[in-house]
């Protein structure tokens, strides 16, 4: 090869002798010759003389005047240190407009490589006889109810031990598929939902789940998956957008680029520079700088990042945070592009992209796919892209098509032959139908008939298997088989094509990148750390004033109080680490994604999260120790002060590491919040304070020796009590006071135990961090979803595959309905005509047709700080600029515009869904001013994010919506019939028993969730319906089903408005009118679409300079293209201004004027009540839904009961028979310790584990309340009331086990008091957890606030410092501390009436309980009432918070 390159270079040198002096090597270098710039030539010559290593790191950069230099000045730069500004300016010069300049830029790159004979590496992917099978539960067994979860767990263990049969049924996901993916060709993967597209992409990318049964093989250039690293050779781009919300778009992509590295670009560049020097070729400066900069790894912001931002159209939002549910960020379409860009910045040569166009308008999709096509064709990549609804022009960009259906390859080969194959099978694509849409529908039993074209033969359903068999005999299929029979010649594989190293950059670089990201996130989450520090400061001030030195003496009695103060310091610091739990779990989904993509190993993630927390630990612990140490009156020695500080630092680190480890093992908020308190409880109970070491049972003593708290307790106690303050010798004893106190509690008395304790804590810190790293290395992301299918869906799948008619299928009815409704585009066909009455049956419950008109509507928000920092002086950012229009009954309106045009914003404003910002303008409903309370009753809003309760079924979701939104006059039977009609209409009947689940985690697929969202609104029978992106995320067939549903809804006389991104021709032409907006929030066309889009085309073609539409081109795509910002700039026009001066605008103004006046004889909307159903019905419905939600949420309900059983058995065995011993004071302390630990820790677990459940349901509540389904109180009632029976079961389990094992006195009264106090204690803790969520915006802050109060309750519980010994200024708090009342009730009911005298004391047990703790037996009834009051108060505050605070930002 080198000889060949040398020969080419020689030929070029010889040829240059007889050319006319010009440079023959490159068009791009002619400018270099023409300029005749001596200084530049000298600079280049100097560069050429550098060694290759230095030469590839330096280049000549043109600095334009706006970048700080003189116009066009050339400067020599180190490309490894190219600034962000220079990088962006360079990309702007190279790719000014992604549409026009991108191909030219790539051709320049290719030309430069071709001139010296260097090839880009290419990859051919082959898959042969690939079969993927999964085991699924069929029918109700797949629902995760409490019963099923127990049965499934027992069954799984039985299967593993081969003692029980496997009840799951095998389901083939991919059935014996074979094919070839060629380099330099774009392959489009099509298929209806459930056809196996994602599974095929994952198989090709080498990322299939280990639980699946896989046979067959996938090879890259003839190499098996085990011979290289597929995760780095190929990039799989998921359909789920998982990103860290606090990072900006640029930071997200830059981090990805930094981790993935530059691949073989550097080696290629070195070879290129060497050959160019030998051939005396001078490259284009900008191309040279780009190639050099893109080959330099380890940069915080790379030129490749700026390039990808540019071609994906993300440069406009590059410095905006990505955002999440609670943090406003970029739009859904932009987030989808970030997911794509995250992988494109890497060096992977093969791309497997899963539904990358969801949420994008068709012009943006076209631009992205076109950029990818240019890259693949010119630079020799390999790409398989799955798209849901590709527009015809996007479809035409692809070279090859793979059509999957029910796990079989129906067609794979050149795009040109696909229609030929289906005509060969007897099916033809209609004229105004997108080919991609036709392909996705033609294999479906319900849609196939309409495309039959053989008039000489009657139509008969052609099953998928028949298509697949026919394809093998079709000429395209035969040629693939022939090619597969010849093995790939491995000698043709470029050595740089397949990655063999596991990670893209060195370990040092990976660690540096993750440290930088962790620092950035700490800065963005500074509020959390400040909050924790303030929390600890307040806690320290309370502790300091509770254990006040002036009220405490150094004697044996107060020695116990000092021990309590030390234990509380340990407890506080330990609890402080608890917040790590929620913060860690929230970051894990993104971590698992990046780990599996081999961005970095687990240790590169865990080390920064540990090391960078250390300075914060110094601050937090410092705050506590510096405030409390001397004020409490601990030993005044400076060395002992710093030793206590050092020990608490080690404990805090150990605690944080422990909770990170638990989060890493649990991987789920509910599971982690269950096992977090369990570990705390185990360590505390065996730590030597609650139960003294001599009293620990011999079968539990091992627990004492492995509890970190026992080492901390020994170390902190010896540090204090061996000090000078405690050195006096007691009369009649030969040991110091300090040693005497230590001995009385079974604590070691040698000074060495401080160092042993410190060493143990540091050892545990290392151990837990190591275990956390191991957990994150080996565990997969948490999923509680078991693969399941309904029986109907399985039968339907089988029928589609084989053609066998399934018994009981309502085939005739549904096919007749489908055929009636098939041609959406035809406004006069089955959709609008009388024969569609069958499909409208049930959609005609009585309602009043209403119009909505709006005039000069403006919406603004406070100017973001980032924009103010850039010098913008206005106080507000205007998002809608005086928008006017109207929507009428029976008219289907499309609200369109490019991403960022303000479509969803306008819809939110009109629907009254905005929670912030400033709204101006006039909005009227049938002429009357809009009132949100009544408007919510007659309107429906289908949100883009499909938000539903995850633990109910599809049918239950619809029942709930209809129950609360249909008026009470509609009886139960009519309601059920109506629900069945809607389910039939939206094709959800086969999914009626399917669990909804969480998006991207479990339950329904994207398109099924979308249909459910629409059905939930349709069952409310609204007059006006808003739909935000109803077809986003759906394939062509599902989109057609949805649009038929929408069309039918309009035909009943309702007003329907849809925002829509990338409609196909037939979907677009199903709309009657179009409301088109441009970026910036202004309308540019409001009017009819017309037959075959004639009116729309006529309007825009009438504007000077607008290009005419090509035959067969999608009008929606054409319209977005000709009205883009780039076109406005090129034509020098403002489309919004043209619209305002048009006749159409005047007609619309007159229409708005007419609709703004109430019709004669009409009355304003008025309802006797705010809600459709009575308050009682709302409460019952909410309770009904929560009942199902809890029953099917075993990760919360079952885990909590399991936790309770474990704790009960642990406590029962730990405090075995201690209840019968009441002879000594220590016996009472031990018994009280068992009560104290149980109350505090089981209570905390209940409080913590309910929070994630409430957070998920609160998001659903925001949607349902906005829809006017119910008020806040019934929701709160349902959430609170459903806990009562579950907590009753929990109390009985705990109470019976513990009461009998500890051996408390068996009398009916004492046992019932014990159960009563435990029940209400668990209730108030659970309601307190709910209240914390209600008062805070997210889980993390709720966890921090909760733990703050747990600490205060712990302090004033009366266990660490009895109420009579608390300083008078804090004693009042005991009366409002719930835990203090619980201990009062438990201790007084068990011991307050025992009259025998204590050993070594003159008092009876009852007197001691009264004197020492201040507990009176005759006060029990008051204590009981207070317990009820606490539970009711927290439940009420939860209701109040839910009613008053809305943390959703819209």
UniProtKB/Swiss-Prot annotation:
One of its GO terms (molecular function) is ATP binding. ATP 1 binds at residues 191-198. It is found in: Membrane. Residues 158-431, 852-1104 form the ABC transporter domain. Keywords: ATP-binding, Membrane, Nucleotide-binding, Repeat, Transmembrane, Transmembrane helix, Transport. Residues 509-721, 1177-1391 form the ABC transmembrane type-2 domain. SMART domains: AAA. CDD domains: ABCG_PDR_domain1, ABCG_PDR_domain2. InterPro entries: AAA+_ATPase, ABC2_TM, ABC_trans_N, ABC_transporter-like_ATP-bd, ABCG_dom, ABCG_PDR_1, ABCG_PDR_2, P-loop_NTPase. Disulfide bonds: none annotated. SUPFAM superfamilies: P-loop containing nucleoside triphosphate hydrolases. It holds the Pfam family ABC2_membrane. May be a general defense protein. This is ABC transporter G family member 37. It comes from Oryza sativa subsp. japonica (Rice).
